């Protein structure tokens, strides 16, 4: 049976044709429109739309887009319940099947709505859920700046803000977008206050473990400032994070010897932890010393003499440290190293450097004026 073309008719006639179409597919629905108005008709149509979701993609898209278009012409106060019901149908129906079609329908609804309508939150959550089930997160908007703006535009409650950020984080993790996921998790944890930080205990724990696992994450001091992470002070997970933020390899080795079972329970690789701590330790050494002997590197990083040069090469590849190997003197000459932490002392150093540049530029400027006036 061909699908009716829902165009060039009144909203009431369109609803009646949808009713007739659903009825022909076996839905338990009257072919007569409700006396309660279009929003009642749509509530009944959405409730019965499961039968048409079993059709071919083209047929489903035609009929469901008709439903979407009718929902969008309603007054805002009548849309919310219908949108929630429609999203629930599209998210849950045969979960995992026909994801591209369900994403398309949800996307049509999302982009057809006024940008400031709070009900867009429900649709966006639906988009995230469907995208996560099929690895299609790249096909929906996930830019954190844009998500922040939507959260503000929709005037979301704290609870809903946490829900959407957590959904987005989990979807990005499932879709192997670790860098983006880490940023979203930091945003989520940063939205907690002293009053509700304890509620994010599990999220904070996950955030720390994921950061420690990430082979590209070396600067972790910003995590210590997050209130849910502060709430974990005194626990082993917080102690471990503190070691990765500012301590040396020897501190990690001692921690591991005393808490091997804990490290294993986190799913962390001791060997990977050792590799990361060697680099972090070397970064700290390079900040304080412009010349470092091979012997010192060997001792501090607990590696053999034949491993030093290979380690230096790998360290430079991370772009956390810039240095050259002086094989004659058996030393490393450092030109730059990234600070593991950026606190008051580092801000002062940055201020002093910028101020020096400013003074030098003023001298150059004055010299040029003197030459031009001569």
Swiss-Prot record:
The disulfides recorded in the entry are none
Q: InterPro entries attached here? A: ARM-type_fold (IPR016024), COPS7/eIF3m (IPR045237), eIF3m (IPR027528), eIF3m_C_helix (IPR040750), PCI_dom (IPR000717), WH_DNA-bd_sf (IPR036390)
Primary location: cytoplasm
GO MF annotation: an example: translation initiation factor activity
GO annotations of cellular component type: eukaryotic 43S preinitiation complex; eukaryotic 48S preinitiation complex; eukaryotic translation initiation factor 3 complex, eIF3m
Identify the residues that the record assigns to the PCI domain, covering every copy: 180-339
| Keyword Endoplasmic reticulum among UniProt keywords | no
One short Pfam family name for this protein?
eIF3m_C_helix
- Cell compartments where the protein resides: Cytoplasm
Q: What are the alphabetically sorted keywords of the record?
A: Cytoplasm, Initiation factor, Protein biosynthesis
What exactly does this protein do? Component of the eukaryotic translation initiation factor 3 (eIF-3) complex, which is involved in protein synthesis of a specialized repertoire of mRNAs and, together with other initiation factors, stimulates binding of mRNA and methionyl-tRNAi to the 40S ribosome. The eIF-3 complex specifically targets and initiates translation of a subset of mRNAs involved in cell proliferation.
Describe its partners and assembly state: Component of the eukaryotic translation initiation factor 3 (eIF-3) complex, which is composed of 13 subunits: eif3a, eif3b, eif3c, eif3d, eif3e, eif3f, eif3g, eif3h, eif3i, eif3j, eif3k, eif3l and eif3m.
User: What is the name of this protein?
Assistant: Eukaryotic translation initiation factor 3 subunit M
Q: What species is given as this protein's source?
A: Xenopus tropicalis
